[in-house]
């Protein structure tokens, strides 16, 4: 059996795409007007930094009203408890007063949740990839606002021949040359897909880079070459 080195090298190479392990499109949970977008596209941010702030005057006013209702319900409950102790009213009135307090407290919890939603904070360290809206723009609930990318470990997505499964497994080393900068990076197979495409006879795989290379960016592409020789019988 004669196999050229060129054929062997071609069989062990495949295209890859660099992706971020943390990437998200953030949407609004409320309908409101944007008053601030502190982090612009391309800028870095830290976990818990404010990414978008909404005009919260309506929700703050709602919370104040509910807080006043809760305070009033608590006063009524206390008064009825004192009257019940003197047997001026029955236990039924006290129970109704307690129900009113519980209801007002639940409404206050909802109001506070709405005010908390007036600020979108960064879930992790990263960079602002895209901004789909502008300051002073009114947006609707569930409307996509921004796209963020985490600054954590990057990975490479690739498709491999299903025939490679006879020798390829998790932890297998590979070398990746990136098209955009011509640099070579070391990585290893991190995960293999759960099923094989019946048409192309390929399977998805994920490779993790051996360290956090500063010259790598999500969206870069390149060629992966597996370092070890293929065993052929």
Q: Each PLM stretch: what is its role?
A:
Residues 10-13, 121-122, 178-186:
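Short coil-to-beta-strand transition motifs
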Residues 17, 31, 35-38, 44-50, ...:
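Surface-exposed patches in structured soluble domains
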Residues 129-130, 184-230:
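Structural microfeature recognizing short secondary-structure transition sites
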Residues 58-113, 131, 156, 200, ...:
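Alpha-helical coiled-coil segments
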Residues 55-64, 152, 157, 183-187:
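Short, Lys/Arg- and Gly-enriched loop/turn segments at beta-strand edges
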Residues 115-118:
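A conserved signal-transducing helical linker
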Residues 2-31, 190-191, 220:
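N-terminal beta-strand block that forms a small beta-sandwich/beta-barrel module immediately after a flexible targeting
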